[in-house]
C-alpha cells in the first residue's frame, strides 16, 4: 500500500527519467510535487528544466533551480582533496561527492515548503540510491523517501518512452542517443553501460568528451603554478580564483593535455562489480599538487597517520556516509594537519602526465642547510650507531633465539 504523501521534493534534471518520475508521483501518490534542479557544473543548461516542469503542471513557486558550483567545490570537493581521497587506488569520487550536497538542499527545501517526502531518480542497482537516502535520513530521520525505480514497473527505456507519450511529456530529440549512461559535474564526467559492460572491450575514442587523447595533446609541455593556503588551492599562476573558477581553469589545462582519464572496475557498496570510465582533469592535477605541497610541510609521522585515514575516508564518501559522525571526526583530524600546508607548487603538464617540478613554502620542513653545519652542532653522524642498534634490537634478539634452537 502506498504511503500517504502530501508534498514531495524531487531531485529533477528535466530529462526523460525524472520527467516521467514527476508525472508518476502526481498519479501514484496524488501529491503536490516540488522540483529541485542543482547546477553543480554538469555543463548543461538547467533553465529548460523550469520550462518542462511548468508544462507538467508544477506551480512556479514550487520550482527551485540553484547554482551550487561554488558551494560544491568549496565545501565538498576541497575538503575531500585535503584528504587526498582515492577509492580503490584510482577513483577520485566525482559522482560520490556530489550527492550529499543535492540531498542536503532537498531536505532544506522540504523544510522550507513544508514537504513530508523527498524523491530521487537513482536506480535500484546502483550506489546513488544509498548515497541519497542515507543523506536524507541523516539530515531528517522523519522524512519519507520515495525511490520510484524500486516501486514501478517502468523498467526499460521503451516503457519510459511509452509512458511519456501517453502522458504528453515533452521529449527532446537529439539524434542518435549515446550508448553510455553519463553523469557530470564540475569535478568529473562518468561513463557506464554500452560496450563498457564487457570489461575486455576498449571504449571508442569519441566516448571521451572532456579531454584530448594523448595522441592529440600538444607536443610541448606547459608549466603552471598552484598556490595553496591551509590545504586548499587559491590561485593559478599567481592569479587568485574562487573555488569553482579555479577548478574550471584546472579542467581546461587537463583537457588540453589529455590528463585525467581512467578505465576501472570498481566494487559497488551494494555488492556487485561495475566498470566505469571517468575523466577528472582538474582533480588529477590538484591531487598531485596537493600531495607535493604536503611533502614539504607535514611532519613524517603526521603524514603517515593521515595516509592511514585516507582509504577509510574515501570508502565513507563512496558509500554515502558524508554526514556520518565518523567522517566528520576524520575531517577534523585531516583539517588539523592542513594548518601549515601553504605555499606554491610548480607543475609540468605533458601528454596525460602531471610532473611536479618545484615546491616551496614558508612552512617548509625541508632544511638542507642542516647538513652544512659543523660536526655535532645539529647532527652528529656517530649518533646513528646507537639509533640503528636500538631499532635492530628485536632482530638481534630473534637471531640469537633462533640460533639456539
Swiss-Prot record:
**Source species, domain of life:** Bacteria
Record's PROSITE patterns? ARGININOSUCCIN_SYN_1, ARGININOSUCCIN_SYN_2
Sorted UniProt keywords = Amino-acid biosynthesis, Arginine biosynthesis, ATP-binding, Cytoplasm, Ligase, Nucleotide-binding
A molecular-function term among this protein's GO annotations: argininosuccinate synthase activity
Can you tell me which residues bind L-aspartate?
Answer: 123, 127-128
Q: Which reaction does it catalyse?
A: L-citrulline + L-aspartate + ATP = 2-(N(omega)-L-arginino)succinate + AMP + diphosphate + H(+)
Functional pathway: Amino-acid biosynthesis; L-arginine biosynthesis; L-arginine from L-ornithine and carbamoyl phosphate: step 2/3
A Pfam family for this UniProt protein? Arginosuc_syn_C
Q: What is its EC number?
A: 6.3.4.5
- Has keyword Ribonucleoprotein? no
Top EC category: ligase
Which residues does the record give as ATP binding sites?
A: 11-19, 38, 121
Q: Name one GO biological process term.
A: argininosuccinate metabolic process
InterPro entries, per this entry?
Answer: Arginosuc_syn_C (IPR048268), Arginosuc_syn_N (IPR048267), Arginosuc_synth (IPR001518), Arginosuc_synth_CS (IPR018223), Arginosuc_synth_type_1_subfam (IPR023434), AS_cat/multimer_dom_body (IPR024074), Rossmann-like_a/b/a_fold (IPR014729)
Checking NCBIfam families in the record gives: argG, PRK00509.1
Q: Which family does it belong to?
A: Belongs to the argininosuccinate synthase family. Type 1 subfamily.
The entry's protein name is: Argininosuccinate synthase
Q: Which organism is it from?
A: Nitratiruptor sp. (strain SB155-2)
Its taxonomic placement starts with: Bacteria, Pseudomonadati, Campylobacterota, Epsilonproteobacteria, Nautiliales
Give the gene name. Answer: argG
Amino acid at each position: 500500500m502506498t504511503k500517504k504523501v502530501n508534498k514531495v521534493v524531487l531531485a529533477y534534471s528535466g530529462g526523460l527519467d525524472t520527467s516521467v518520475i514527476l508525472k508518476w508521483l502526481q498519479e501514484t501518490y496524488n501529491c503536490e510535487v516540488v522540483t529541485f534542479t542543482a547546477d553543480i557544473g554538469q555543463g548543461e543548461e538547467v533553465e529548460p528544466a523550469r520550462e518542462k516542469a511548468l508544462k507538467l503542471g508544477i506551480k512556479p513557486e514550487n520550482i527551485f533551480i540553484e547554482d551550487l558550483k561554488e558551494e560544491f567545490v568549496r565545501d565538498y570537493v576541497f575538503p575531500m582533496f585535503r584528504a587526498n581521497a582515492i577509492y580503490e587506488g584510482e577513483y577520485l569520487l566525482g559522482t560520490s561527492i556530489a550527492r550529499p550536497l543535492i540531498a542536503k538542499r532537498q531536505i532544506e527545501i522540504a523544510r522550507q515548503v513544508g514537504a513530508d517526502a523527498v524523491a530521487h531518480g537513482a536506480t535500484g542497482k546502483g550506489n546513488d540510491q544509498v548515497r541519497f537516502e542515507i543523506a536524507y535520513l541523516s539530515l531528517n530521520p522523519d522524512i519519507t523517501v520515495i525511490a520510484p525505480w524500486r516501486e514501478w514497473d517502468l523498467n526499460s527505456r521503451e516503457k519510459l518512452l511509452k509512458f511519456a507519450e501517453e502522458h504528453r511529456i515533452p521529449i527532446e530529440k537529439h539524434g542518435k542517443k549515446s550508448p553510455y549512461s553519463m553523469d557530470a559535474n564540475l569535478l568529473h564526467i562518468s561513463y557506464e553501460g554500452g560496450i563498457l559492460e564487457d570489461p575486455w572491450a576498449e571504449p571508442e575514442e569519441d566516448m571521451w568528451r572532456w579531454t584530448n587523447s594523448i595522441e592529440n595533446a600538444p607536443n610541448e609541455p606547459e608549466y603552471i603554478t598552484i598556490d595553496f593556503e591551509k590545504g586548499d588551492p587559491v590561485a593559478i599562476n599567481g592569479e587568485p580564483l574562487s573555488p569553482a573558477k579555479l577548478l574550471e581553469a584546472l579542467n581546461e589545462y587537463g583537457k588540453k593535455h589529455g590528463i585525467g582519464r581512467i578505465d576501472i572496475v570498481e566494487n559497488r557498496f551494494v555488492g556487485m562489480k561495475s566498470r566505469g570510465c571517468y575523466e577528472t582533469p582538474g582533480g588529477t592535477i590538484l591531487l598531485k599538487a596537493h600531495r607535493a605541497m604536503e611533502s614539504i610541510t607535514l611532519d613524517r609521522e603526521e603524514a603517515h597517520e593521515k595516509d592511514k585515514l585516507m582509504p577509510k575516508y574515501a570508502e565513507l564518501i563512496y558509500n554515502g556516509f558524508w554526514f556520518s559522525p565518523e567522517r566528520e571526526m576524520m575531517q577534523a583530524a585531516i583539517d588539523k594537519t592542513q594548518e601549515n600546508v601553504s605555499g606554491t607548487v610548480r607543475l609540468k603538464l605533458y601528454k596525460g602526465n602531471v610532473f611536479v617540478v618545484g615546491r616551496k613554502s614558508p612552512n617548509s620542513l625541508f632544511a638542507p642547510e642542516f647538513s652544512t653545519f659543523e660536526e655535532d652542532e645539529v647532527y652528529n653522524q656517530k649518533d646513528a650507531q646507537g639509533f640503528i642498534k636500538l631499532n635492530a634490537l628485536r632482530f638481534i634478539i630473534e637471531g640469537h633465539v633462533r640460533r639456539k634452537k
